[in-house]
Amino acid sequence: MKMKINKVLSTLFLGLFVIIFAVKEAKAASSNGNNVLVCIDPGHQAKGNSQLEEQAPGSSVKKATVASGTRGTVTKKYEYELTLEVGLKLRNRLKEKGYRTFMIRETHNVNISNKERAIMTNKAGCTVYIRIHADSSHNSTVSGVSVLTSSSKNPHTKKVQKASDKLSRDVLSEFVKATGARNRGVSYRDDLTGTNWSTSVNTLIEMGFMSNPEEDRKMVSADYQNKMVTGIVNGIEKYLKER
């Protein structure tokens, strides 16, 4: 009788171990690709569009659909060029690691509003939505990286705000580790059309200031772009593992 009980207990423990192992493997598989879809939006485009669109669903406030962005003070590279370079490298790195990806644009000659970009990613069923941008300031000494997400008071982003906040913080911290860039923190913005229309967990990263000569030169270099991509990927993976 005792031997039978021991045998049953051994079988139960073995079964429990198998279940725990399977759950861990499933979580690992999910975080390393398979079911994960990363949507990448290289900010801006070659020509801005000043036509107006709703800032948020049902909002009476309207904004220009999309701008062409800023330009490097030294390199003269346009923001829309830089964001696509980094976006394509990010896509390639993620694919190498087994993730599925969805690009909002792969060329400069498009006309896609910020609202349309968000809706595209909603329809795609993104796990995370990464919006890539670069910053500018009248003060050429200003430098560093920041991330933008909605506040907890935003009625349009309630379902994803908390997760988006975590994704933003994870991407920011890992970006700073990978690049050594100055950490300018998280900016909570409720006036961003692309954020307000998104039903996916999302963040907008301002990778650096194109108005700062040193940072402008850095961001166009292949080596620094690879570091930026490493930081973004590490941030995405940190979020996926801890969500």
Q: Which sequence ranges carry the predicted segments?
A:
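Sec-dependent N-terminal signal peptides of Gram-positive bacterial secreted proteins and lipoproteins
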Residues: 4-28
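Active-site-adjacent mobile loop/cap segments within catalytic or ligand-binding domains
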Residues: 39, 131-139, 148, 183-243
